[in-house]
Amino acid sequence: MIHVVAERRLGRLAVYGPDGHLWHLADASGEARGAGMRAPYGPGNPIAPGHYRLLGQVEHDPPTAEDGPGAIDVGDLDNTTRRRLIDAGRARVRGDALEIASLTGLAGGLAEYGRTAIVIRGGGTILAHLTPPEDPLAPYQRLTRSDGGLRLHNADLARLLIILKPAFKDETTIVLTVLGEPRRTSLH
């Protein structure tokens, strides 16, 4: 199992390998536009704290203003994966919650709030519309609000795509744990 932990209060995303060692650390924003219905975690709002599964990734060549170098799909932690993690000793049931790597949270929450998936992405199309305009494809672009997923700097996302590519190919389980509520950013 690879464990990706998004600590929204700190604005940070950490990637831990199967042995628990830190592989990658990056700035991240979990702030959403907040314009959607079904608050506080429905479409247009931030993802609920808890455990999720990374489902796959798409690499863009060339990068796009919306996603930067690519996007990583995030879905609810399904019952089969949850059972596999418990049976392997990688997770424990704690009442209604699940403990993974000493972090306790609910398993998923997307479906509960009318979502099927969200993404981890780079880019930020609003940057090109600012005065003066900023480059959404810059390696360390300003992190802007999204539709509720997580946004990384393009350089960090490019590295994360490289790190996770073999794991997706080998069908390694990749868990995303989202901690806390999002920080507030100044861009819509």
Where are these regions (language model features)?
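Extracytoplasmic
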Residues: 1, 8-10, 49, 67-69, ...
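Short linear motifs in intrinsically disordered
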Residues: 1-7, 60-63, 164-165
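N-terminal post-signal-peptidase region of extra-cytosolic proteins
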Residues: 1-3, 26-51, 55-56
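Short beta-strand scaffold segments in enzyme catalytic cores
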Residues: 11-15
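Secondary-structure transition/turn motif
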Residues: 16-20, 75-78
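Surface-exposed loop/edge segments in extracytoplasmic proteins
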Residues: 20-26
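Exported/periplasmic cell-wall-interacting domains
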Residues: 62-188
